[in-house]
């Protein structure tokens, strides 16, 4: 049987501009795809309007172009994919794999934060209710090509998780699985902050009888205070000057080799060199790395 062509992707949410932590995820997924002569797609995950920042999607795409991370095909926006999500919800409902739940957030918090299946057999209607996946074959562990075998919290793995929220918005776990399957993604390279929901996503792939991609979770970049570089923590946007020093800092973070005189290479040649010398096995097998652990390994630019 012929192997499927490699398809990777970068799927940011437009809740702010790209920062150094975002660049690590984008660069790692880009290099992994290009090193295997595969496709690299970009998808804007704009399914949560309250968290979105006006103009952020355009700034994200401009930053990727500025840093030479050019994608294949058209950019997909999740806000234009509602019909596909509704069709998937209908399919799961018809197969008895989902149900409506009117439990409040406060009730679930009183239970310790994990849902107890209270509405599983109540046959509630959809009005004002969330929709949950009926977990029939929970996934308790998965293999990560970088981190190795990863075990999930069994209670979290068994939970009937939400696939459509009470306010009518589609849940992240539903949208990401539907879109990755639609786009033919064969491997997902992303930050280690998304390890936890992976078993839920694999369970949903199984329920939909869809092929499960392989996973690579890259180490997160931690700031000086030990917190993850993120939009929520107000990480500064990527510099808009010469992109090469910042790319070199990201390559160092991923423990990739550098050409001796990278300053003499233009952006395109630097990225081509990085693709040719990319080794996933050299990326640290850790879930997080502090940017000040080895200051000589990082550019002095303020992230």
Swiss-Prot record:
The organism's place on the tree of life at top rank: Bacteria
EC number: 6.1.1.-
Family note: Belongs to the class-I aminoacyl-tRNA synthetase family. GluQ subfamily.
Co-factor binding details: Binds 1 zinc ion per subunit.
List of residues binding L-glutamate: 9-13, 45, 172, 190
One Gene Ontology biological process: glutamyl-tRNA aminoacylation
Matches recorded under NCBIfam families: PRK05710.1-1, PRK05710.1-3, queuosine_YadB
Key word Acetylation present: no
Residue positions of motif 'KMSKS' region: 228-232
Residues reported to bind ATP: 231
Gene Ontology molecular-function annotations: ATP binding; glutamate-tRNA ligase activity; zinc ion binding
Cofactor(s) in the UniProt record: Zn(2+)
Positions contributing to Zn(2+) binding: 101, 103, 115, 119
InterPro entries: Glu-Q_tRNA(Asp)_Synthase (IPR022380), Glu/Gln-tRNA-synth (IPR000924), Glu/Gln-tRNA-synth_Ib_cat-dom (IPR020058), GluQ/Sye (IPR049940), Rossmann-like_a/b/a_fold (IPR014729)
Function: Catalyzes the tRNA-independent activation of glutamate in presence of ATP and the subsequent transfer of glutamate onto a tRNA(Asp). Glutamate is transferred on the 2-amino-5-(4,5-dihydroxy-2-cyclopenten-1-yl) moiety of the queuosine in the wobble position of the QUC anticodon.
UniProt-recorded name of the protein: Glutamyl-Q tRNA(Asp) synthetase
PANTHER family: GLUTAMATE--TRNA LIGASE, GLUTAMYL-Q TRNA(ASP) SYNTHETASE
Species for this entry: Serratia proteamaculans (strain 568)
Motif 'HIGH' region boundaries: 12-22
Entry keyword Transmembrane: no
């Amino acid at each position: 049987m012929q192997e499927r062509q490699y398809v990777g992707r970068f799927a940011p949410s437009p809740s702010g501009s790209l920062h150094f932590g975002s660049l690590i995820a984008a660069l790692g997924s880009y290099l992994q795809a290009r090193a295997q002569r595969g496709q690299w797609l970009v998808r804007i995950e704009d399914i949560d309007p309250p968290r979105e920042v006006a103009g952020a999607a355009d700034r994200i795409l401009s930053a990727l172009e500025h840093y030479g991370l050019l994608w294949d095909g058209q950019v997909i926006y999740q806000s234009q994919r509602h019909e596909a999500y509704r069709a998937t919800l209908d399919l799961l409902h018809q197969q008895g794999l989902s149900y409506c739940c009117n439990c409040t957030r406060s009730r679930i918090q009183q239970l310790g934060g994990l849902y107890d299946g209270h509405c599983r057999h109540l046959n509630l209607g959809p009005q004002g209710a969330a929709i949950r996946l009926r977990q029939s074959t929970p996934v308790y562990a998965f293999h990560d090509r970088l981190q190795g075998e990863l075990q999930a919290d069994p209670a979290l793995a068994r939970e009937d998780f939400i696939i459509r929220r009470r306010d009518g918005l589609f849940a992240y776990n539903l949208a990401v699985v539907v879109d990755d399957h639609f786009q033919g993604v064969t491997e997902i390279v992303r930050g280690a902050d998304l390890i936890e929901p992976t078993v839920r996503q694999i369970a949903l792939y199984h329920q939909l009888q869809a092929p499960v991609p392989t996973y690579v979770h890259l180490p997160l970049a931690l700031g000086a205070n030990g917190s993850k570089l993120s939009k929520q923590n107000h990480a500064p946007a990527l510099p808009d000057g010469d992109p090469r020093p910042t790319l070199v800092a990201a390559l160092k973070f991923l423990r990739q080799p550098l050409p001796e005189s990278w300053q003499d290479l233009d952006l395109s040649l630097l990225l081509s060199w990085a693709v040719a010398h990319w080794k996933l096995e050299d990326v640290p097998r850790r879930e997080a790395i502090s940017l000040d652990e080895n200051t000589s390994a990082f550019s002095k630019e303020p992230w």
